[in-house]
Amino acid sequence: MNTAKKFNLWMGIALLILCFFIIFVVYPLILILYKSVIDPESSKLTLDYFTKFFARKYYWSTLVNSFYVTVCSTIIASVIGLPMAYVLRSVKIPGSKYLNILIVISYLSPPFIGAYAWIQLLGRNGFVTQIINSIFGVKLDGIYGFAGIVLVFALQSFPLIYMYVSGALKNLDNSLNEAAESLGLTAFQRVRQIILPLVMPSLLAGSLLVFMRVFSDFGTPMLIGEGF
């Protein structure tokens, strides 16, 4: 009886959440899609709105630039997150538990605040920029433009790759690695032939989430882009 009550309670909560999701997320998206392909005067199917959108170079170039930044940021985030997860899982490093916590916490900061923090560090008048200028006499342009956007996005997003890959490595059977080592495979060969194929689904899942987060972020390019 108690089990049935708990089941009904959680089922009711799930249905309530589903209703809110349909009303406030699914329905507005369907309505926008409907209005984008229906002519309000003739009520006929039309693609004029999409034609006008892609005919303007400004919108088209913005979409291409966003895609370019997103792909580069996702690749760099994967290059950082994958080896870091493997090293922290495979090598006993003092304080690795605290480092793992810091990596996860760094992902929790909002992108807008993270971008502003990087400007305070590496902007034209940033803390690190002023130190380099005062010691070496080198005046840096700061962390602006395409390279700055990609760098900030990658450093903001790599913890997601790290968490996914780290979870996959935690569930791997160590006997596979030991068997490969007994067969004479080098560390690089073990990573390339055994570890990487097994964690690839988690890596792709994390990369997809990074791609969506970066592509939908407006605050970071607005602060760092400077017209890119």
Label for each model-derived stretch:
Residues 183-185, 197:
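Glycine/proline-centered hinge or cleavage motifs at structural transition points of membrane proteins
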Residues 1-2, 45-54:
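A short amphipathic helical element positioned immediately N-terminal to and/or at the very start
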Residues 176:
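Helix-turn-helix DNA-binding elements, focusing on the entry/boundary residues of the two helices
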Residues 94, 185-186:
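Short coil/turn motifs that cap or connect alpha-helices
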Residues 212, 221-227:
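Contiguous mid-protein beta-loop-alpha structural module that forms a pocket-lining wall or clamp
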Residues 42-47, 227-228:
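Extracytoplasmic catalytic/substrate-binding loops of multi-pass membrane glycan-assembly enzymes
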